[in-house]
Amino acid sequence: MMRKWQLVFHIDQVNTWALVLGNVHNFLADIAAEDEAVIAVVANGSAVTVWRDGQAEIRRSIQDATHSGTVFYFCRNALRGNDIKEESLPDYVQTVSAGITKIVDLQEQGYAYIKP
């Protein structure tokens, strides 16, 4: 019987992007043949600076993850706090008014919370 997983990964430090993206990749690889997954990544704090700090490889990995259906939400409060204009983000990244509110909303919908 196919199982449908719902996960929300929370990232708030720019230096943990590789870990979070690795976790997403490993999870999807582990369940690929048997189950379905809906994955959200919510970025707040310094994690949003990935778009400003010349981390092209991580940004490519984020874009690649969207091809498997992973959705990325960036916190507008964190963007403002880090002087990053929302318009500078690529189309495959969504913004939310507050990252913490999005996390709570997803948990209310049954998503499992993961903070690597």
Language-model features and meaning:
Residues 9-21, 50-51:
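Short, glycine-rich nucleotide/cofactor-binding loops
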Residues 6-12, 42-44:
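Short glycine-rich or small-residue beta-strand-to-loop segments that form or flank ligand, phosphate
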Residues 39-44, 72-76:
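Short internal beta-strands
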Residues 14-15, 47-48, 78-81:
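Solvent-exposed loop/turn segments at secondary-structure junctions
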Residues 31-35, 65-66:
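Short helix-capping segments at alpha-helix termini
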Residues 18-33:
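Histidine-anchored nucleotide/phosphate-binding helix
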Residues 52-116:
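A cross-taxonomic marker for long C-terminal extensions/tails that follow the last structured domain
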